[in-house]
């Protein structure tokens, strides 16, 4: 680029400068568009992560509820096992009485 007293030496020099400015302008425009697209992608990813976070929280609540149900079932099973033991003892007692009656 040749500039003499604030003026370009030739129209060709001016054209080269204008072409460079046009290229830079287009580059900035393209980069600006890319930044907008990337910004939208980041927003979408953020929304997705937030939704997944909510889903995880819901699953944690479900898992906690299932854990409570399992505890209740274990308590019921233990109680049923104790009841069965009592029934078995009662049956053993009845069997002994029957055996005693039969042996007499």
Curated annotation (Swiss-Prot):
Domain of life of the organism encoding this protein: Bacteria
Coiled-coil blocks: none
A Pfam family recorded for this sequence: DUF16
InterPro entries: DUF16
Family (UniProt): Belongs to the UPF0134 family.
Protein name: UPF0134 protein MPN_104
Lineage of source species: Bacteria, Bacillati, Mycoplasmatota, Mycoplasmoidales, Mycoplasmoidaceae
């Amino acid at each position: 680029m040749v500039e003499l007293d604030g003026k370009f030496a030739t129209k060709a020099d001016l054209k080269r400068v204008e072409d460079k400015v046009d290229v830079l302008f287009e580059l900035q425009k393209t980069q600006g568009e890319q930044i907008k697209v990337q910004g939208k992608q980041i927003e979408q990813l953020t929304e997705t992560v937030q939704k997944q976070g909510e889903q995880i929280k819901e699953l944690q609540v479900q898992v906690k509820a299932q854990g409570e149900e399992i505890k209740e079932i274990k308590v019921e099973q233990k109680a049923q096992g104790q009841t069965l033991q009592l029934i078995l003892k009662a049956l053993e007692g009845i069997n002994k009485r029957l055996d005693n009656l039969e042996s007499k």
